[in-house]
């Protein structure tokens, strides 16, 4: 039996991770957050705020875990630098301190972002130094979200170097899936357009643009693989789909699912902003034996099935949710 703590389990990837962990026979899953998560998540909820060091320690006193997954971060730049640092950096450090003092802990998995390299939709796109972008690519963050994500990585890996805390870092690209909470909240608007079935805006600024996405299910599964593989500690891995996708390919996949739907560019954000960006997943394949399972067609079919199954009506709107830190978690 594996005992797992998911910090940020009420967010977008966190909810899917909780579901996957809970589906494993005999595993015990706890979810830590400030407010009880909306919906029916199969995990024991622990009330705590990661930004409050002593109350966090008190909430976890006497508890032992095999794995801690840390997904509790602000899902974008809030415009409040102190809040960004308090949640993303101070909150993470509190969790790392507790993990360091937990004798039976076997892995601490940090959910980071490709924004640690620099790319963030609200910042003007700058082409990579080379492509596909691997984990050795220079990091050049210039906005508070990207800077705090890179700083998270450095802080977490310092605990690995100094204290031998078995930390693994995953750099997630844009994650596509149903529900659309936290870092995936924009996908709920996309799902609404799919539900209407007339016109849908896709997250590209042009049909020629090339971006790299990952299915929500693959993103969660890679967290589990990173928690279990002996070669993962001390490493950073890209967490992306097997292949990049152009606007034309994205549109064609949608039209196969929804014949006759009008597909246009102009979604509120785009990863490459009309340019091209591709990531390299060879390190995850070679060191972790991890290969993403779902292509863009599979992912969009999954979102559509959720919509047609009443997902929009069943799932709380993210605007009404409160996450682990008082704001939406990733």
Which residues make up each language-model segment?
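NAD(P)-dependent short-chain dehydrogenase/reductase
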Residues: 123, 157-210, 254
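Conserved Rossmann-fold NAD(P)-dependent oxidoreductase catalytic core, especially the SDR/UDP-sugar
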Residues: 94-143
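N-terminal Rossmann NAD(P)H-binding glycine-rich loop of SDR-like oxidoreductase domains
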Residues: 4-24
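Mid/C-terminal beta-alpha module of Rossmann-like enzyme folds, strongest
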Residues: 222-270, 314-315, 320, 326-330
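NAD(P)H-binding glycine-rich loop region in Rossmannoid oxidoreductase-like domains
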Residues: 47-87
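Conserved C-terminal active-site "lid" loop/helix of NAD(P)H-dependent oxidoreductases
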Residues: 216, 248, 269-291, 312-314
């Amino acid at each position: 039996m594996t005992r797992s703590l998911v910090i940020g389990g009420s967010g977008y990837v966190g909810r899917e991770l909780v579901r996957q962990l809970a589906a494993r026979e005999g595993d015990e899953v706890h979810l830590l957050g400030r407010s009880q998560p909306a919906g029916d998540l199969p995990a024991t909820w622990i009330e705590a705020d990661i930004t409050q060091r002593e109350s966090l320690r008190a909430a976890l006193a006497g508890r032992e875990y095999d794995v801690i997954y840390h997904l509790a971060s602000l899902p974008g730049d809030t415009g409040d630098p102190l809040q960004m640092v308090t949640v993303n950096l101070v909150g993470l450090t509190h969790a790392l301190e507790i993990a360091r003092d937990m004798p039976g802990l076997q892995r601490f998995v940090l959910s980071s972002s490709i924004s640690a390299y620099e790319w963030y939709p609200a910042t003007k796109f700058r082409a990579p130094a080379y492509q596909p972008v691997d984990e050795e690519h220079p990091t050049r963050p210039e906005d508070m979200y990207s800077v705090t994500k890179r700083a998270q990585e450095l802080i977490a890996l310092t605990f690995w170097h100094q204290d031998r805390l078995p930390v693994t870092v995953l750099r997630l690209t844009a994650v596509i899936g149903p529900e659309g909470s936290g870092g995936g909240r924009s996908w709920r608007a996309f799902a609404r357009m799919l539900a209407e079935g007339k016109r849908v805006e896709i997250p590209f600024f042009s049909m020629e643009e090339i971006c790299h996405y990952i299915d929500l299910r693959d993103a969660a599964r890679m967290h589990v693989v990173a928690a279990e593989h002996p070669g993962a500690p001390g490493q950073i891995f890209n967490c992306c789909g097997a292949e990049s996708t152009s606007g034309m390919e994205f549109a064609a996949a949608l039209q196969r699912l929804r014949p006759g739907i009008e597909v246009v560019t102009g979604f509120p954000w785009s990863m490459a902003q009309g340019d091209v960006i591709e990531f390299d997943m060879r390190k995850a394949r070679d060191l972790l034996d991890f290969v993403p399972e779902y292509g863009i067609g599979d992912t969009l079919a999954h979102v559509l099935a959720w919509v047609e199954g009443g997902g929009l009506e069943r799932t709380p709107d993210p605007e009404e949710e409160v996450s682990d830190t008082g704001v939406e978690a990733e």
